[in-house]
From Swiss-Prot:
Gene3D superfamilies: 6.10.140.2220. The keyword Zinc applies. SUPFAM superfamilies: HIT/MYND zinc finger-like. PANTHER family: PROTEIN MSS51 HOMOLOG, MITOCHONDRIAL-RELATED, PTHR46920. Pfam families: MSS51_C, zf-MYND. Zn(2+) 1 binds at C105, C108, C133, C137. A zinc finger (MYND-type) spans 105-149. This is Putative protein MSS51 homolog, mitochondrial. Disulfide bonds: none annotated.
Length: 460
């Protein structure tokens, strides 16, 4: 167990609770806005790291969003009212300003403000995603860009189509699985199960007024229907990857979801992105993965949890078939002391961390260490996902050094199929959310460093 003084370093006062019911099968409760959040924020670190590759990029983003500081940006993201003139007069202005945040030379990293009067940033005509300040930079950059140009074309389309999720014009198709759950092992079998019904649903979205308005507002030609349908499918996998990956963990770790009173999953280090667009029905798919379950609680814990998402500390039994979403702002080891140890919330059957990033920063590793030790010492079944094979290797090495008992790792059959562009390094190979997973349970890892290297090098 982590030393108590270390684990209590980031204490914060408990928040108030106001439970409500948002849907017949999904219970959700709003979390009040808190003025400050403890510990390092991966969202904040990520924002300011943009300047490492493109000096001044963070300020360009704030400028295009009509904001004066990152604090004001976070205030708006957290549901507050900005002090300056944030907002857009029309959709065309919004999309243009969003696109302007990507305008810098991919080769020399020049921003618009640093160009001479004779130069202007123009995008690659193939992917419409990467900009150059002139033919010389574009020609010099082509050997690097050609490897990712096609994928970045998909990124550019997805970035616009994702707006349909924000507005609610693309509602994820859902319903009980017509196939036995054990027959659905990956996206191929999931899409086969959904079949023509899913295609009809996506086609209805494509002919909607919302899609017509979207592409009329962005100032570029509308792609072909098959391109747009492919984008909707990628967006669908991006949203459903998290609940289905949780299901993968419950399956692989042999957790009984038919226990009286329901089962509990804690999502640790939950980010703003994970919670901001999450809607009550998004986790229904997790329930359909386990027909006959007696209730599933999904509690998201993190310093960047979206304001207004949810918070609940109820220990009441769930109704069979119910999925309860809730959240808590703060670090997990503090949440454990304040909520779990005091009996205010349920002990987890599974803990999951999507892209914890503890391998990437000493500050993040320091914040994660008490939680990782807690999970190890309490022998809590734990699932971690990462973006890439490189992150997998680095994370495995850290977990081995912490003497965790790694039970499984590999490629995630329910990874997101939506490519993610590295914002400030656009020609870096795009990554995919939850591309790989690691599972561990307790201590005394059975793989030493040499065995681990052999397993990783042998292919996953």
């Amino acid at each position: 167990m982590a030393p108590r003084s270390r684990r209590r370093r980031h204490k914060k006062p408990p928040s108030s609770v106001a439970p409500i019911i948002m849907a017949p099968t999904t219970i959700v409760t709003p979390v009040p806005l808190t003025p400050s959040k403890p510990g390092p924020s991966i969202d904040t670190l990520g924002f300011f790291s943009l300047d490492d590759n493109v000096p001044g990029l963070s300020q360009l983003i704030l400028q295009k969003l009509n904001m004066k500081s990152y604090e004001e940006y976070k205030l708006v993201v957290d549901g507050g009212t900005p002090v300056s003139g944030f907002g857009f007069r029309c959709p065309q202005e919004m999309f243009q300003r969003m696109e302007d945040t990507f305008r810098f030379c991919a080769h020399c990293r020049a921003l618009p403000s640093g160009l001479s009067d004779s130069k202007v940033l123009r995008h690659c005509k193939r992917c419409r995603n990467v900009y150059y300040c002139g033919p010389e930079c574009q020609k010099s950059d082509w050997p690097a860009h050609r490897r990712v140009c096609q994928e970045l074309r998909l990124v550019a389309v997805d970035r616009l189509m994702e707006w349909l999720l924000v507005t609610g014009d693309f509602v994820l198709p859902s319903g009980p699985w017509p196939w036995p759950p054990e027959a659905v092992q990956d996206w191929d079998s999931w899409f086969s199960m959904k079949g023509l019904h899913l295609d009809a649903t996506l086609d209805a979205v494509l002919v909607s007024h919302a899609v017509t308005t979207l592409w009329a507002s962005v100032g570029r030609p509308r792609p072909d229907p098959d391109v747009l349908q492919g984008s909707l499918k990628r967006l669908l996998t991006d949203v459903l990857s998290r609940p289905l990956t949780l299901g993968l963990g419950l399956r692989a770790l042999g957790i009984d979801v038919r226990r009286t009173g329901g089962s509990t999953v804690h999502v640790v280090g939950a980010s703003h992105v994970e919670t901001f667009l999450t809607r009550p029905g998004d986790y229904d798919e997790l329930g359909y993965m386990f027909p006959g379950h007696l209730g599933l609680r999904v509690v998201m814990v993190g310093v960047d949890v979206a304001t207004g998402f949810s918070q609940s500390t109820s220990t009441s039994p769930l109704e069979p078939g119910t999925i309860q979403l809730s959240a808590h702002r703060g670090l997990y080891h503090d949440f454990w002391e304040e909520q779990v140890e005091t009996g205010q919330t349920h002990h987890p059957d599974l803990v999951a961390a999507f892209h914890p990033g503890f391998h990437s920063s000493p500050d993040l590793m320091e914040a994660w260490l008490p939680t990782l030790l807690l999970l190890r010492d309490y022998k809590i079944p734990t699932l971690i996902t990462v973006y890439s094979h490189q992150e997998l290797v680095s994370s495995l090495q850290i977990l081995v050094e912490l003497d965790t008992h790694i039970t499984a790792f590999g490629s995630n059959p329910f990874m997101s199929l939506k490519p993610e562009q590295v914002y400030s390094s656009p020609n870096k190979q795009p990554v995919y959310c939850s591309a790989y997973y690691i599972m561990f349970l307790g201590s005394s890892c059975q793989l030493d460093n040499r065995q681990l290297e052999e397993k990783v090098d042998g292919g996953i």
